[in-house]
Swiss-Prot record:
Coiled coil (residue ranges): none
Pfam name, any one: Ribosomal_S19
UniProt keywords, alphabetically: Ribonucleoprotein, Ribosomal protein, RNA-binding, rRNA-binding
Record protein name field: Small ribosomal subunit protein uS19
Gene of this entry: rpsS
Protein source organism: Bordetella avium (strain 197N)
Length: 91
């Protein structure tokens, strides 16, 4: 289920403050955040946001195709190493 349009997109208040400060100050330093649930807004375009994936902050450069998605979609939390190979199938 998607979010109601009358409610509007959700963005954490502390992230909004950091983005506004970065845009006003023309700061190119990545913005660190743990807020994976925040929606990407058009104001974020051109910024680099370091999104926490549970272990480290993954830098995500925001472009216009990402608007409307959540920040957590671009910082993967699970690492797939592959299934164990079957020894009989290799021969």
């Amino acid at each position: 289920m998607s979010r109601s349009i009358k409610k509007g997109p959700f963005v954490d208040a502390h992230l909004t403050k950091k983005v506004e400060a970065a845009v006003a100050g023309k700061d190119k330093k990545p913005i660190k955040t743990w807020s994976r649930r925040s929606t990407i807004l058009p104001e974020f375009i051109g910024l680099t946001i370091a999104v926490h994936n549970g272990r480290q902050h993954v830098p995500v450069y925001i472009n216009e195709n990402m608007v409307g998605h959540k920040l957590g979609e671009f910082a993967l939390t699970r690492t797939f190493k592959g299934h164990a190979a079957d020894k009989k199938a290799k021969r």
